[in-house]
């Protein structure tokens, strides 16, 4: 798995940095899949993931409001769906650490690569059309 800055650049330093941080958390989850991890270590990474993803979504939604992105409501619903999916995995797989880390890793990777490439790129396109003429 590699981090491709061109795919997920938002033309916003804060959001781009957060994407990199989420990528690093995804790497931690991936490494946890390859070895036995204790619940204490897992809780630290889960806390880091939830804090970062909520902070990122909040900052990204503020950016969308700032640029008056017309599809903010749709994009915000996608953010809520991602958070709910993460929370459901944590609840449903609480007793199965390896399954939980594997599923969470897939969701986070999907968010980082697919969501940013598909949905966040729409924000970038809107921003560039509106402000970089």
UniProtKB/Swiss-Prot annotation:
The keyword Iron applies. Pfam families: Hemerythrin (PF01814). Fe cation 2 binds at residues 60, 75, 79, 115, 120. InterPro entries: Bacteriohemerythrin-like (IPR023504), Haemerythrin_Fe_BS (IPR016131), Hemerythrin (IPR050669), Hemerythrin-like (IPR012312), Hemerythrin-like_sf (IPR035938), Hemerythrin_metal-bd (IPR012827). GO terms for molecular function: iron ion binding; oxygen carrier activity. Fe cation 1 binds at residues 19, 56, 60, 120. Keywords: Iron, Metal-binding, Oxygen transport, Transport. Disulfide bonds: none annotated. Belongs to the hemerythrin family. Monomer. This is Bacteriohemerythrin.
